[in-house]
Amino acid sequence: MSNPIWFVKLLERLFPHRFLLARLTHIPIVGKVTDHLLFEGDDLIYLPQDRVIPVNQALDRPDEMVLPSQVVEHFIEKASYHWVMNFCICRESMRCKDYPIDLGCLFLGEAAMGINPQLGRPVTKAEALEHVRRCREAGLVHLIGRNKLDTIWLGIGPGDKLLTICNCCPCCCL
């Protein structure tokens, strides 16, 4: 059962204070409890933008290269379930002026089908690929992985049936 919208709105109101809340985790017991409840089992990776900038060196061009967008596209192609959030909770919470708020996270996997429909919608594989392309063109960077916090705030599970692809901006996102 997904979480109600009021819970998401509460998170949006707390989000601007995330750095203060993060500092509280320096208190040993608060840090241990927070890690256990919200982050245990996380496996997240930021993928750099699709560009290579050589610095003062001559480089041979490799025959093949996996670009970060190809990693994301691989998982989209393999997934049976695709679900796009209709806003970025980070950018909406921070009232971002530099990047589109409507380019939200993409969730893959069976658990994504339990997300509250007021937050977004299921999409086809082609729509998911188009979504990440628009995110890249907007200058957003992909964060991909399994995130326990997403299963908590979205009220879904199991976590091993959900893969999150966030589309992060440098000014608002975690």
Where do the language-model regions lie?
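Redox cofactor-anchoring modules in respiratory/redox and cofactor-processing assemblies
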Residues: 140-174
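Iron-sulfur (Fe-S) cluster-binding modules
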Residues: 1-142, 159-163
